[in-house]
Amino acid sequence: VTAAGRAAARLAAWRPHAAAVYGSGLWALPEGARVEDEVPYDALGWPAGAVPGHQYVVRLAVVPGDAGRELRLALACGRPHLYEGWTEEELETPVRALAAAGVTRLVLTNSTGALRPPAAPDQAVVCSGVVDLQRPPAGEVPERLVVCRDEDAARVAGALGAAAVPGAGTYVAVCGPQFETPAEVTWLGRYGDVVGMSAAPEARAAAATGVECCLLALVANVAAAVSSHEDVLSAGGRLAGLLAAGLVPAVLARWPDLLEG
């Protein structure tokens, strides 16, 4: 058995109720969580990028729940990006590996830019779909990947209260690494509410492996009002707090029967 195989077996033995992939600067643990194990991406054979704000480690954490029940989470703290030179297949590796380890529920998170109201900084937009502009469109309209049903996204947004924009949103995935110009923001706003440089490969891998999803796009800035990755990371501390408070409520709202039985 290879080292990567042994590391993958640790994930499978953990039997998480759900997993989450954390975006730039968003690695804060859920409130009340304790970490019981850590597995570096390298040990799993997963791609580990070089962009600041990502830790490239899977944390296996437990969050105490009601009636003595505990929520087991696999938290993938960091993601590689298309603009770093990774292939789509490589970017799908973490989600496919989590699925192979028995994960059937996944929360994707990222730091994102607002394209149009009501999306605004320091709020979450719970997205039911991803418009994939990282791939050339087959026709006149870009491909839209389904993340979850609109009603599921709206239920999660409701559980987050004032921290989230009500209802379901749409995320637009672009290649990067450059940030959007005002003209591009106007055009992209025809397709979605928020924009970022991730999520499409993961959503595609989740659909292919039967993993149920939820996408929390945490708004770091108004698109076209940011000039560097450092600007995004400066908002990360605020957004990490939002995610620390909101991840477990989001998971339990998306899958209400998760801890039953």
Task: Label each region the model flagged.
Residues 104-105, 193, 212:
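Short acidic/polar active-site loop segments enriched in Thr and Asp
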Residues 1-147:
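Metabolite-binding pocket within alpha/beta catalytic cores that recognizes anionic/polar moieties
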Residues 10, 155-164, 242, 246-254:
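Generic non-transmembrane alpha-helical segments
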Residues 173, 194-198:
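Catalytic beta/alpha-barrel core
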Residues 147-190:
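Active-site rim beta-loop-alpha module in soluble metabolic enzymes
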Residues 223-261:
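His/Asp/Glu-rich mid-to-C-terminal helical/loop segments that flank catalytic regions of hydrolases
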Residues 98-102, 189, 207:
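Non-catalytic positions within long, well-ordered alpha-helices that form the structural scaffold/packing
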Residues 197-234:
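Zn-dependent metallopeptidase/amidohydrolase metal-coordination segment
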